[in-house]
């Protein structure tokens, strides 16, 4: 071995000796200081529920008595949450243990990670479930862009399709996007315009919609949307579901007091015979002080949308629609437990003597607007709904919400606001999400006046 190698070896050994010696000194000092600090601490006090291991028995802690009443009041809610989340947690444990998600993602995603195929499914009580596939692509239209195609089937009479394209990159202050939708269902629900009735019926819809928008974000908190839309919607008698007859047997034309089956009365169901064919332009403003919209965040949210629609073909209607929303999320504990309060309202204003098509009227009874009632069961010229919702985390990327709604439907310009009945519903929902999109949600809601239990579950691709 050369002299230079011996010198280098000796120098390395000496440096190693210094490191080991220094580490031993530091460890010894920490042990001494730790022993001194422990010697200065008073012994555990059993009267305060303290133990020698430093823990405090919750049952013996003074705060335990104060929490007894809230725990008792929340016991039914906690039990319901546990019942709903139990299968989800069991499934989550199985998925995590066997790496099911990673395997499925790898099998349905291209090697670049920006394109892939995902399953989608939706189910709501009293409606046919749908299932299909969604293709997503964040590469073809350019870096940060989005291309999505969705197709779902229920049966031969239920079909949904969607094609969405956003060529602009995420994060730009100006965004543009296009969307094409196709919907064919024969189990749509209608029970009249005005207060919910017992004359429940089903109708079929065959609709094609083309939508485009330009979105400006001058600041992080403010967004401005300019949108255009054209649609063709055709209606027909539906399939008897849950004992609800086709619409032509319920809201029919009467001659000499007798119902003429399969001929829908246009006075009771405006636009059914002509269809809803329109061109629409919209302007929307959104103010959102929350950092992100889906994860629990405190802040203020306000929105205003005004659109104008003009019919074509057999649809001669012309009308404005106005939507407003105000909400606030209050931080109850560590930014993860929130109380969300919001009020939202819709109204339409016809500009001629042609009634607004029934399908374009404001409705309540939807996943995000009084889900305790049949979808579209509360319908009129204007609607107003107030919601109180409590949200809290239950698992990584998942949260639960307990909500109560109070709302109603009214005639033009809310003219009968004081005299019309309002409706209550309560519900519980579990949501699995990313920072910007729901992956899966499941919930149960109950409509107090005239409604019933409504169960919904759904999932889609990111």
What residue spans do the PLM features occupy?
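Short glycine-rich, acidic/polar surface loops and turns
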Residues: 387-389, 415, 425-430
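Short, positively charged and aromatic/hydrophobic N-terminal segments
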Residues: 14-15
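Bacterial N-terminal signal peptides
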Residues: 23-35
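Outer-membrane beta-barrel strand-turn architecture
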Residues: 80, 139-141, 155, 167-171, ...
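Small/polar, glycine/serine/threonine/aspartate-rich low-complexity segments that form flexible
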Residues: 123, 411-422
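N-terminal targeting leaders of membrane proteins
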Residues: 38-118, 252, 270-273
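C-terminal outer-membrane beta-barrel translocator/porin domains of Gram-negative envelope proteins
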Residues: 97, 114-119, 136, 246-406, ...
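Gram-negative/organellar outer-membrane beta-barrel architecture
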Residues: 109-282, 363-364, 376-381, 438-440, ...
């Amino acid at each position: 071995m050369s002299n230079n190698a011996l010198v280098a070896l000796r120098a390395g050994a000496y440096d190693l000796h210094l490191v080991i010696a220094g580490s031993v000194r530091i460890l010894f000092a920490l042990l001494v200081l730790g022993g001194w600090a422990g010697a200065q601490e008073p012994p555990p006090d059993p009267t305060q529920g303290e133990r020698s291991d430093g823990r405090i028995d919750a049952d013996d802690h003074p705060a335990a008595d104060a929490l007894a009443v809230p725990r008792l009041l929340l016991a039914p809610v906690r039990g319901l949450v546990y019942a709903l989340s139990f299968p989800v947690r069991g499934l989550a444990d199985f998925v995590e243990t066997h790496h099911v998600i990673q395997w499925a993602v790898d099998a349905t995603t291209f090697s670049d990670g920006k394109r892939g195929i995902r399953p989608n499914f939706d189910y709501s009580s009293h409606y046919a479930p749908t299932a299909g596939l969604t293709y997503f692509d964040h590469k073809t239209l350019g870096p940060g862009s989005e291309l999505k195609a969705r197709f779902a089937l229920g049966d031969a009479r239920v079909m949904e399709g969607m094609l969405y394209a956003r060529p602009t990159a995420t994060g730009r202050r100006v965004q543009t996007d296009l969307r094409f939708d196709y919907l064919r269902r024969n189990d749509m629900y209608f029970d009249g315009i005005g207060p919910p009735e017992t004359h429940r019926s089903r109708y079929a819809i065959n609709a094609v919609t083309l939508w485009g928008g330009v979105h400006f974000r001058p600041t992080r908190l403010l967004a401005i949307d300019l949108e255009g839309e054209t649609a063709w919607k055709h209606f027909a008698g539906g399939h008897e579901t849950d004992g609800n007859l086709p619409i032509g047997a319920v809201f029919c034309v009467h001659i000499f007091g007798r119902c003429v089956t399969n001929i829908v009365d246009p006075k009771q169901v405006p636009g059914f015979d002509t269809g809803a064919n329109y061109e629409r332009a919209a302007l929307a403003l959104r103010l959102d002080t929350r950092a992100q919209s889906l994860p629990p965040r405190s802040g203020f949210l306000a929105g205003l949308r005004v659109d104008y629609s003009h019919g074509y073909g057999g649809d001669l209607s012309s009308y404005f629609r106005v939507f407003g929303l105000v909400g606030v999320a209050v931080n109850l504990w560590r930014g993860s437990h929130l109380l969300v309060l919001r009020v939202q309202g819709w109204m339409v204003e016809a500009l001629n003597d042609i009634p607004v098509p029934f399908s374009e009227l404001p409705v309540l009874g939807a996943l995000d607007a009084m889900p305790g009632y049949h979808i579209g069961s509360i319908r009129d010229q204007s609607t107003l709904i107030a919601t109180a919702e409590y949200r809290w985390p239950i698992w990584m990327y998942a949260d639960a919400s307990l909500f109560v709604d109070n709302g109603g439907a009214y005639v033009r310009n809310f003219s009968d606001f004081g005299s019309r009945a309002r409706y209550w519903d309560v519900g519980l929902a579990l949501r699995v999400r990313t920072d910007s999109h729901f992956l899966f949600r499941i919930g149960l809601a109950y409509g107090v006046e005239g409604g019933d239990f409504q169960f919904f579950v759904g999932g889609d691709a990111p």
